[in-house]
UniProtKB/Swiss-Prot annotation:
UniProt GO molecular function: ATP binding; ATP hydrolysis activity; proton-transporting ATP synthase activity, rotational mechanism
HAMAP family: ATP_synth_beta_bact
Membrane topology qualifier: Peripheral membrane protein
Signal sequence extent: none
Protein name, UniProt field: ATP synthase subunit beta, chloroplastic
Function: Produces ATP from ADP in the presence of a proton gradient across the membrane. The catalytic sites are hosted primarily by the beta subunits.
Binding of ATP, residues: 170-177
Top-level taxon in the UniProt lineage: Eukaryota
GO cellular component, one term: mitochondrion
Organism of this sequence: Anthoceros angustus (Hornwort)
Quaternary data: F-type ATPases have 2 components, CF(1) - the catalytic core - and CF(0) - the membrane proton channel. CF(1) has five subunits: alpha(3), beta(3), gamma(1), delta(1), epsilon(1). CF(0) has four main subunits: a(1), b(1), b'(1) and c(9-12).
Gene for this chain: atpB
Similarity comment: family membership: Belongs to the ATPase alpha/beta chains family.
Length: 492
């Protein structure tokens, strides 16, 4: 692919420092420069030339180490096939820069900020370097506020913090992608915000599927691309470790522009944060650093911190991040997930059991947690309602073994009432999504936090004990439950 030098923050490569490749070890290059002409750490270098077959080569690298004797060690952002010793390397004199702003919406980019969706070039008049400092303390917004998503189970039981970081846990086929798309849709409608999706080291097929589903659900508008609500940045499994290590920063940089310049609320999705750590581990080994615990890089905490600290609320806007977390061998004490947990404000756990029952979103109400669910943050009413819902569901879980063996009739009157209410709560936690309208045929619902609390209070208080369970399934607020119950009664 032809490299756009404007994207790299360089208008011309004439009069730049030029060196030559002295060693190639996979994706790592050693480059020798003339004395006194050494590039800085994180500067991007460009290797141009022709391979033995006569094809053009254009490889961008990032300086990682200064080795002495006028040598630097750099990591390639694309495949190093066809590179040979002695090839000329040009120092651009600046870190890698990527395009930012409205031009990125509805498009797919690689780590270098080049469009890879075959929809033509984009305007690159505004670029940001991918290595930036976290906002200063004086710019931070320290007020704790809830980020309302319009999804009942999330807002009530594991509320997101505005400018916070949320871990999304779930296996294959339980609805992670649909939940992500609904959040992208809701932030655009309710908050006037935009989203950036960073695909870090995941399957190319999944990235393609997500793009197709976003077009189908109109999150990406093919007819008018400027009406799209999301920018996509992909550095998938087949990319070299340098690209996978930096693609998260490319996505974050695009999100920072919307927060700092456009003063918007931004959702940043990173799928998968573990692959960011994994790529860093590969690069660390290639650079010859001594590995730390379990073979991870010694700079694990620093690398994670430099990414996570840039994700925050300022007085201008906010970046709320939702990060899919892969847990290797289901070991939560592994250094990669353990380091990630230190930064998270909430966890959303998707349950295969709920998905099997047809309850979507399949968010586990008992396993999902949030640091925001405190009475002095969300208020006494919200806190008490959430605790009541959790207690009822927990009691139902404890009684399930007895019900399976002896049947419902053997329970006490009080327990039978608890089970009936718990089953209604379980169904009321389901909700039709806007982005799933094309599959389900039922219109999506955005439920405000006030309506959510009111609905669950009425169920817990026994005001709706007379309504059938089916009336609570896949509806929005409590008024729709009573309307659905009347319809069911008329039909029967």
């Amino acid at each position: 692919m032809k490299t756009n030098y404007l994207i790299l923050g360089v208008s011309t490569l004439i009069s730049k420092n030029v060196g030559h490749i002295s060693q190639i070890i996979g994706p790592v290059l050693d480059v020798t420069f003339p004395p006194g002409k050494m590039p800085n750490i994180y500067n991007s270098l460009i290797v141009r030339g022709q391979n033995p077959a006569g094809q053009e080569i254009n490889v961008t690298c990032e300086v990682q180490q200064l080795l002495g004797n006028n040598k630097v060690r750099a990591v390639a952002m694309s495949a190093t096939d066809g590179l040979t010793r002695g090839m000329k390397v040009t120092d651009t004199g600046a870190p890698l820069s990527v395009p930012v702003g409205e031009v990125t919406l509805g498009r797919i980019f690689n780590v270098l900020g080049e469009p890879v969706d075959n929809l033509g070039a984009i305007d690159v008049s505004t670029t940001f370097p991918i290595h930036r400092s976290a906002p200063a303390f004086t710019q931070l917004d320290t007020k704790l506020s809830i980020f309302e998503t319009g999804i009942k189970v999330v807002d009530l039981l594991a509320p997101y913090r505005r400018g916070g970081k949320i871990g999304l846990f779930g296996g294959a086929g339980v609805g992670k992608t649909v939940l992500i798309m609904e959040l992208i849709n809701n932030i655009a409608k309710a908050h006037g915000g935009v989203s950036v999706f960073g695909g870090v080291g995941e399957r190319t097929r999944e990235g393609n599927d997500l793009y197709m589903e976003m077009k189908e659900s109109k999150v990406i508008n093919e007819q008018d691309i400027s009406e799209s609500k999301v920018a996509l940045v992909y550095g998938q499994m087949n990319e070299p470790p340098g690209a996978r290590m930096r693609v998260g920063l490319t996505a974050l940089t695009m999100a920072e522009y919307f927060r700092d310049v456009n003063k918007q609320d931004v959702l940043l999705f990173i799928d998968n944060i573990f692959r960011f750590v994994q790529a860093g581990s590969e690069v660390s080994a290639l650079l010859g650093r001594m590995p730390s615990a379990v073979g991870y890089q010694p700079t694990l905490s620093t690398e994670m911190g430099s990414l996570q600290e840039r994700i925050t609320s300022t007085k201008e806007g906010s970046i709320t991040s939702i990060q899919a977390v892969y847990v290797p061998a289901d070991d939560l004490t592994d250094p990669a997930p353990a380091t990630t947990f230190a930064h998270l404000d909430a966890t959303t756990v998707l349950s295969r059991g709920l998905a099997a029952k047809g309850i979507y979103p399949a968010v586990d109400p008992l396993d999902s947690t949030s640091t925001m669910l405190q009475p002095w943050i969300v208020g006494e009413e919200h806190y008490e309602t959430a605790q009541g819902v959790k207690q009822t569901l927990q009691r139902y879980k404890e009684l399930q073994d007895i019900i399976a063996i002896l049947g419902l009739d053997e329970l006490s009157e009080e327990d039978r009432l608890t089970v009936a209410r718990a089953r209604k709560i379980e169904r009321f936690l389901s909700q039709p999504f806007f982005v799933a309208e094309v599959f389900t045929g039922s219109p999506g619902k955005y439920v405000s936090l006030i309506e959510t609390i009111k609905g669950f209070q009425m169920i817990l208080a026994g005001e709706l004990d007379g309504l059938p369970e089916q009336a609570f399934y896949l509806v929005g607020n409590i008024d729709e439950v009573t309307a659905k119950a009347e319809t069911l009664q008329m039909e029967s």
